[in-house]
């Protein structure tokens, strides 16, 4: 299954706010709560609930079905909480790190920056969005006016809060990966254990 390229608000209305997918936030009106008193909400099956959580993860991080399955399989082979390890793997993708630094408004935009050769990791240009960043990696912007202007412009509109596992000097456009992200710093309303359960027969 390829990446979704349709209307983003349609997905947000169905799954809830997905910060990495779109910076547009779902509007919750009081009138919709009143309607809920008249119309009973359809009860979801356990499978549907797991599917919904899986879709949240896939859309938010912009990965394909096959990629997500591979991440789950890798997480299962690592000692610890499979759900948290899965989230850490997705959070350490280069496109997500660029988004978290505020260099891009969404992960999709961050992916384009990487694809177009604007991003440097440890003094080497990296054009693979799924590149897995590691603690002590130094991430910077390619030293040309086009790259620096694009990212400086994005930063001027960014209000993202920098998580403690990242350090960033905006003046020089140089960032450092301090370590792995803690679960509490992942701004996504999701039950990652249900995602692991969804893939339990496949992974």
UniProtKB/Swiss-Prot annotation:
UniProt GO BP: ribosomal small subunit biogenesis; translation
InterPro entries (UniProt xref): Ribosomal_uS4, Ribosomal_uS4_bac-type, Ribosomal_uS4_CS, Ribosomal_uS4_N, S4_RNA-bd, S4_RNA-bd_sf
Disulfide bonds: none
GO CC, alphabetical: chloroplast; small ribosomal subunit
Gene3D superfamilies per the UniProt record, alphabetical: Ribosomal Protein S4 Delta 41, Chain A, domain 1 (1.10.1050.10), RNA-binding S4 domain (3.10.290.10)
Compartments in which it is found: Plastid, Chloroplast
A Pfam family that the UniProt record links to this protein: S4
Boundaries of every S4 RNA-binding domain copy: 92-150
PROSITE patterns xref list: RIBOSOMAL_S4, S4
Molecular-function GO term, any one: rRNA binding
UniProt KW keywords: Chloroplast, Plastid, Ribonucleoprotein, Ribosomal protein, RNA-binding, rRNA-binding
Family: Belongs to the universal ribosomal protein uS4 family.
Subunit architecture: Part of the 30S ribosomal subunit. Contacts protein S5. The interaction surface between S4 and S5 is involved in control of translational fidelity.
Free-text function comment from the UniProt entry: One of the primary rRNA binding proteins, it binds directly to 16S rRNA where it nucleates assembly of the body of the 30S subunit.
Protein name, entry field: Small ribosomal subunit protein uS4c
Record organism: Chlorokybus atmophyticus
Gene that encodes it: rps4
């Amino acid at each position: 299954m390829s990446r979704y390229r349709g209307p983003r608000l349609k997905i947000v209305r169905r799954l809830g706010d997905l910060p990495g997918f779109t910076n547009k936030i779902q509007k919750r009106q009081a009138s919709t709560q009143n309607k809920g008193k008249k119309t009973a909400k359809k009860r979801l099956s356990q499978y549907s609930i797991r599917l919904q959580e899986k879709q949240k993860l896939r859309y938010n991080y912009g990965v394909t079905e096959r990629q997500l399955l591979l991440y789950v399989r890798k997480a299962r082979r690592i000692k610890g909480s499979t759900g948290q390890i899965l989230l850490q793997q997705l959070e350490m993708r280069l496109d997500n790190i660029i988004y978290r630094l505020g260099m891009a408004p969404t992960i999709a935009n961050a992916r384009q920056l990487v694809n177009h050769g604007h991003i440097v990791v440890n003094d080497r240009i990296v054009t693979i969005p799924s590149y897995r960043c590691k603690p002590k990696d130094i991430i910077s912007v390619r030293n040309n006016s086009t790259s620096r202007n694009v990212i400086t412009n994005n930063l001027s509109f960014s209000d993202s809060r920098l998580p403690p596992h990242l350090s960033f000097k905006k003046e020089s456009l140089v960032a450092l990966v301090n370590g792995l992200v803690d679960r509490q710093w992942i701004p996504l309303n999701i039950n990652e254990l249900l995602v692991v359960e969804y893939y339990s027969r496949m992974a």
